[in-house]
């Protein structure tokens, strides 16, 4: 008797719940067809975004792992130690200080000529100065750019037509010397310019990148 009574009460509760749902009086979490359709669309969009993020992560993990600090041997996760060491190498790579002998030779060469030497002459100067300490062709190029910028800052602000023509000639020669080698080293001064470069040099680099 007790069992039948409980079953009867349960069936009665179910009937009342169905009746409330039909009348819209049930306050439970029931979604309409429109809400279900919106939810399906949101789930589909989320799945597409997840797939794109996975592809992006895989592509970044496989692109230059040593320079980006990512270590594929550890599952492709970001390695902060590797990233910090890589950034340290980049920041200290261009901190070159000439020796006293190198500086004397560079000053004498600068006094003999005018402006920045061409690519071949820079290579010869770097070879000569390498006997007195560590130096690269990029160091030589940047030194002449810095030296030329310092000289211009010391000159009066008035410029003649001849001076402007000389600047155009030097800029043309710099572009030609940069394009001779075709290697990355030729463009290191563009990617990592020295902080002492003058505004004229930065403007000439911008014009070179546009052409």
UniProtKB/Swiss-Prot annotation:
One of its GO terms (molecular function) is DNA-binding transcription factor activity. Residues 91-155 bind DNA. Pfam families: Homeodomain. Signal peptide: none annotated. Residues 147-183 are annotated as: Disordered. Keywords: Developmental protein, DNA-binding, Homeobox, Nucleus, Transcription, Transcription regulation. The keyword Transcription regulation applies. CDD domains: homeodomain. Disruption phenotype: Retarded growth of the primary root, and partial sterility with aborted and short siliques. Late flowering under long-day conditions. The double mutants wox4 and wox14 exhibit reductions in vascular cell division. It is found in: Nucleus. One of its GO terms (cellular component) is nucleus. It comes from the Eukaryota. Expressed in root vasculature, pericycle and stamen. Expressed in the procambium during stem maturation. Acts redundantly with WOX4 downstream of the TDR/PXY receptor kinase to regulate procambial cell proliferation and differentiation in vascular tissue, independently of any role in vascular. Involved in the regulation of gibberellin (GA) biosynthesis pathway. Positively regulates the expression of the GA biosynthesis gene GA3OX1, and negatively regulates the expression of GA2OX1 during secondary growth, which increases bioactive GA content in the inflorescence stem. Promotes vascular cell differentiation in the inflorescence stem. Transcription factor which may be involved in developmental processes. Belongs to the WUS homeobox family. Overexpression of WOX14 increases bioactive gibberellin (GA) production and induces radial growth with strong lignification of vascular stem tissues. This is WUSCHEL-related homeobox 14. It comes from Arabidopsis thaliana. The gene is WOX14.
